[in-house]
Structure formats: C-alpha cells, structure tokens
Amino acid sequence: MTPAARLQAAIEVLDEVVASARDDGPPADSIVTRYFKQRRYAGSKDRRAVRELVFRAIRRSGERPDSGRAAIVGLADDEPDMLELFGEPRGPEPVNAGEAAAPSAFIPRWLEPELSPLIADGEFAALLERAPLDLRVNVARSSREEVLRGFPAGVPTPLSPWGIRLPSDSRVDDHPAYDAGLVEVQDEGSQLIALACDPRDGDAIVDLCAGAGGKALALAAAAPGARILATDSNRGRLSKLPDRAKRAGADIETRLLNPPNELGELEDSREKADVVLVDAPCSGSGTWRRNPEGRWRLTPERLDRVVAVQQRLLDIAAELVRPGGRLVYAVCSILSREGAAQIDRFLDGHSSWISEDPPIAGGRSDGRGRLLTPGHDRTDGFFVARLRRPC
C-alpha cells in the first residue's frame, strides 16, 4: 500500500470506529483486525502503519468526530505533510477549503465539569499517554525479586509491592513465568485496589463485580487461606476465571448472578463477609490511556445509567458485610459522581458506617476516598474508598 492508500484505509477504519462507538459496538482493536482479515493483500508494515494512524486520530479527538475523514483531516491539520497525500492515487479526495476537521481535545467538553477537582489541566496529557505493561507477581508462589530475574527489562512498581513494570510493547503470554502462574497482567492501580481490601487468611471475601477475576486472583495470592466468592452478572467474563485460577493455584468459588435478584442469590453470604469488594462498572475514564476511544462512547445518558448501577451495587454490598467488616468501593474513573459523591450518598443513607483511609501508597485524598491518576501516580486513574460496618 502507498502512504496515500494507507491514509484512505485509516479513514475507512475510523468510519467504522465512529459508528461502533455511537452504537456501542465492537472496540477499535477488533475493527482494525476485521478490516485487514478482509484485505489479505496488506502486509505487516501496512497494517502497523494504518493502525498507528487510526489510534493517533483517536487519541487526538476528545469528542466523537462526525466521520473518519473529519478525524484524519484534523490530524493532517497538525501534520501538514500529510495534506499532500490527499488527492493522490488510491488516496482520499483532496481537502476542500473550510472542510470540517475534528478539533484537538483531551476530553469531551461536556465532561469537564464532571472531573474530580483534583485533576488539573496539566494532567490531561497524561490521561492519553501510552501505558506501560504492569505485571502482578503471584506472591503465593514466588517473590517479586525472584520473578524479576526472568524479566531483564522489568523494574519494580513504585506503589504496589507485588508489581513489575515493563515497556508498553512487551509480550508476556508466552513467557515461562506466565505459563507457570507466577504473574498476571494487571495495572498497578488495580493491584492497589486489592491491597486496599487488606485480605487476611480466614477472611470470607466477596468480590461482587469480579469480571474475569483479576482482583479476586490478587486477593487469593495475598491471603491463600481466605475464602473468596467471585460473582458477576456477565457469564462470558466470569467464565474466564476458573482457568485463570487453576493456572495460579488459587481456590476461588464463582457464582453467576441474575439482576435484579442478586441479594436472593447471595442469601448465604448476607451479613457474613469480612470483606466485600465492589469494583463497580463505570465510565472507564481512568483507563483512557489504554482505551482512548472510550471518550467517544461515553454520553451523559450512559453516565447517568452507570452511576445508578453503582448506587445499587453499593447498597447490595452493604447487606453482605458482617458487623465490623469492611466494604471497599473502587471505580476506574476520575469523575466525582462515580467516586467521592457516591461515597457521600452511601454514607448519607448509612450514617453509622465509618470511613477509613485505604491502606495504600500514592494517590490524593478525594472526599472520603483516594484518587490515583496517570499524571500524579503513573497508574490508571481510579477512586477507592474503604468503609467499615459498625459492630
């Protein structure tokens, strides 16, 4: 493919990404893969170049553009040499005078008032920097120092005692340490959420929104003698956990829940859990550096829906915590409505509960929780709070 043809291909891919973001369809990665499966003539250099163009355009545009062409025209505004490719054979049509171009922005304009007040303008760029690859060592089987010997490019993560940081383009799925269940891919921020739970041998722990089980596995590694129940309403995600647990040597019970009947399906855990972790569904605004198109998918209506889900999950979790037990709430979000404001709302309705400072390194106090961000902590952005039920 010529450079002009690559540019045209990027426009075609971005058209699909824009439509998919609007309609809550497949992510950009999947769209790029599908595009080239249908075009076997494209070589590896072509695929790499088109993918890079697509994600540069996505990172540049905070708002969902009207079209893939608008996204690329906007990118060309920043890189004048690219304009020369418009109008070339197999390339896009020439740019017209005054043609609409996607504006450059870090975040959607409508979201700015929703940000935590701790987020300064100077942190916006870090929200979209490429994230490193973080590993979590399975400390039930090995130590970080021992595992680090097998990763010459790795360094200890500064905040999590379990973490190893690798360059962003590292591959680990074929590494002997991965095959042996000694490491899992997990951002340092997610590791800190597990640390905030302070799991102990003998604890009864419920991971209410376990997904594919990354944090449940971290809890099991930190406290092999704990009894862990991992639940979720997404069958596809939860079904991945048993194989992961087997590889890690972890004993974790899984249970598929059916909203809105979660409490009935968890009756055997009511007021019996030492720890309940609510790693709630959220806007994903803290993970934009890994998923920049998430900015294109989020709308005010979707944010309202997810905030309501978070409120409901917190209320369910409160019913499971034993007297004297602890509830840990976390979201990979930098928006106040999903973080500090959620805890304020919960405590308004549960005034006897006690707010505790999560026992983690890093972050800044944000209401009655802590906020970590890429710009301040070099982790994904997330909010975490810990609450204790009165005895």
What are these regions (language model features)?
Residues 1-391:
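S-adenosylmethionine
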